[in-house]
């Protein structure tokens, strides 16, 4: 099974030139591309992702070279202890193409797909304006339709609000969800606390929320 939807690459490269750092590559979603159990939707990639640089020859996928997102997946039993420990022990410069590929192959096996609403890579973590996220709205909906996940987990107020087209407070969604229709097909969306970066303090709340979802 393919780990990425390569038909998206050309458009994402164009958008990177418009909205991302010109010296970096965009980061497309990756993982289980056919009926994943979880479709995790986060914000946007930064230069902390080691696969965003021109010298990288392997899969360009979310969160490579970072640590916190893998803790979330481990706590959700979506990542093995062995793989998790390696993500935490490696320095960014020690991540390589082989381990990164095996990591996403494991996620695919565990029915996980990771992506960002905006795929344009920035040099730092400064917030993107809503208008940039909205440029990726159509592409993200296509991403959901092509993968056909059992559920979409949208992380954070900003991502959830833009994606759902209304003001969202994730604290109001402890036991509820939203439904979206894409090409006459319904998908359940579960707004959830943002678990990394500025939202690291909310990781326990995000884990509790995701574990409460019955699929």
Regions found by a protein language model. Name each.
Residues 175:
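Catalytic phosphate/metal-binding cores of nucleic-acid and nucleotide-processing enzymes, i.e., regions
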Residues 2-151, 157-172, 186-200, 205-213:
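A polyanion-binding, active-site-adjacent surface
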């Amino acid at each position: 099974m393919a780990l990425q939807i390569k038909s998206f690459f050309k458009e994402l490269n164009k958008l990177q030139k418009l909205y991302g750092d010109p010296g970096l590559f965009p980061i497309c979603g990756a993982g289980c591309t056919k009926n994943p159990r979880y479709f995790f939707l986060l914000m946007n990639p930064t230069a902390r992702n080691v696969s965003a640089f021109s010298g990288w020859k392997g899969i360009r996928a979310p969160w490579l070279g970072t640590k916190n997102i893998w803790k979330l997946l481990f706590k959700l039993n979506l990542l093995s202890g062995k793989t998790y420990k390696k993500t935490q022990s490696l320095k960014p410069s020690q991540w390589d193409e082989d381990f990164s590929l095996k990591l996403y192959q494991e996620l695919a096996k565990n029915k996980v797909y990771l992506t960002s609403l905006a795929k344009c890579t920035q040099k730092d973590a400064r917030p993107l304006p809503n208008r940039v996220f909205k440029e990726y709205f159509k592409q993200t909906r296509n991403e959901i339709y092509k993968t056909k996940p059992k559920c979409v987990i949208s992380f954070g107020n900003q991502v959830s609000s833009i994606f759902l087209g209304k003001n969202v407070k994730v604290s109001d969604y402890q036991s509820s969800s939203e439904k979206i229709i894409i090409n006459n097909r319904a998908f359940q969306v579960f707004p959830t606390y943002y678990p990394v970066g500025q939202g690291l303090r909310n990781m326990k709340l995000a884990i509790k929320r995701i574990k409460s979802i019955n699929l």
